Amino acid sequence: MNRNSIHLGGRPVSRRTALALGLGASAAAMLSGPSLAQSVTLRYGHNNEPASVAGAQADWFAEAVAKYSGGDLAVEVFPSSQLGKLQELAEAVSLGTIAFSHNTAGGIGSLYEPFAALDTPYLYRDVDHLMKVVDVSSPVMQELNEGLIKAANVRVIYAHYFGRRNLTANKAVYSPADLAGEKIRAVPFPIYTTAVEGLGAAAVPVDWSEVPTALATGVVAGQENPVNVILNVKLYEVQSHLMLTGHMSNAEVVVMNEDAWQGLSDEHKEAVTKAAVEIRERATKAIQENEEKDTRALRDLGMTVIGPEEGLKIDAFRASVDKLVQERFGEKYGALYEKIRAIS
């Protein structure tokens, strides 16, 4: 056996991968074969609060993996950016220092650029269309997953609906003209800064862990996120207005280190796959069921909610965003956009 590898379920894996599975260096050096196969722990780091659906689904996934593996395979979850910020978490999965994380498609685009196209604003007809595109068995996702594995040693295991992203600010906004000169927080990836600039604002990249402070101190005047995030993080305490721009329909993409995946036994792979199918559906359903309720809750908590009925000019936002997307990404992602639109 290579002195820099161990055996997991009968398969050789690197010491780095063993550490990604949550084993200490001494344990990784001493254990091999059947003893490791009986008990494996994989680390899952993410940036969301445990109370949010995005955070809770990681815990649900851990529970489902334990259930389907008969307790032989454990997933240890580290929420709230304990193991790093968004970019750091993406890189940690690629390097193998953790086994799992979840991220936006735009964030995963930092590992394999074409992936970011999945987060293009105003791209999907509806939620059903989005979920068909990001199903791991769809032709689009299969193509992207193959590229991601080759480029970054990372594979997608599932993607759940994350919500429609909406704008918040401390003033009423009805059209792109109302955002001229306003500094709005953007997820620190190009497709997101483009979305915010397309809405009419000046995009300020800020990591999620720093957003509440940035809003409270005036570093940025607003931000954009699904309503479940706005509610769970209590952004209504520092933002007075919610604009239902719905400019992005997002999937949260759960990824796994490829070496860690290949190091699992067939039985453990099956447990992960079954858990992925179950939690994708559960998380998607939870977010869909809560969107209207969460919007009402934000209104009840004092936010002024502005939608088309209140004069929000969705067509103007769409036209402005589409123009900028075409300028920046039309040539790069045009063929992929056509494949996405062709899925029915």
Q: What are these model-predicted stretches?
A:
Residues 32-34:
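N-terminal signal peptide c-region/cleavage motif recognized by signal peptidases
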Residues 135:
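An acidic, glycine-rich surface segment that forms the CoA-thioester-binding/catalytic face
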Residues 2-13, 17-26, 36-131, 144-344:
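N-terminal secretory/targeting leader peptides
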